[in-house]
Amino acid sequence: LEFCEKITRRMAEHFNKYDCIIGWQLDNEVNCETNEYYSKSDHEAFRAFLKERFGTLDNLNEKMGTIFWSQTYTDWDQIHLARRSTVGTGIANPHMQLEQVRFISHSAVHYLALQASIVRETAGDRFITTNGIFGNLDYQKLMESGVDFIMYDSYPNFAYAMDRPDGGEGDLKDRNSSFNLARTRAISPLFGIMEQQAGPGGWNFRIHQASPKPGQLRLWTMQSVAHGADFVSFFRWRTCSFGTEIYWHGLNDYSNRPNRRLEELSLVKAD
């Protein structure tokens, strides 16, 4: 957090000088690929979190029901982030597992709140937001952390990723996108789309997706607007020619020449 604070402050002080900056996106897709952590410092922070919540070990033991299956703690150092039990693959204590989820959410919200407070010092009337709907994160508390609203990343084509066991045509697998748009609106009545799918996608090792059919980009954009999005931006503008996201196509192809997707976007503008 020390380095996070320094970097955020330097960036805010530098870029808030420019009138062309209309707002700030904090981080990117917090808790996306990884939302569980097990380093030494994470275990220590989890103990500190529990001490603040429960005060004493006796109180924690009572609230967590640790007397069941001989889990009673006699020292704070005996507590770790939830571990697998010796009985099958489940977590031994569901109450401690819930506290772990609360701890992870608390850590992420605190991390974003720190950045928001620093940016706000010099942001003026610029908006502050973050993007994505992911696990182990209490978005109601996130909305109270200093952001003005949240953004959603809309990738309907994920439903048909070629490496999914149930991939392929049919079965309306993309309806999850409608659900997530409705969920985003419930969390943040004012919201936007930070990343609207702009073409075929995929990393170099997974989630490969076919090219959208003619009219699908326009359809997906209107889907976001129909669900209440006040802002739509596309990911990405120009297809990257290197790196893990080399197959994640933008509105522009590798050639940077006019193409069907750009023509379709012009129809969206006309709409």
Question: What function would you assign to each model-found segment?
Answer:
Residues 1-149, 153-174, 237:
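Polysaccharide-binding and catalytic clefts of secreted carbohydrate-active enzymes
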Residues 79, 125, 155-158, 164-271:
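Carbohydrate-binding surfaces of carbohydrate-active enzymes
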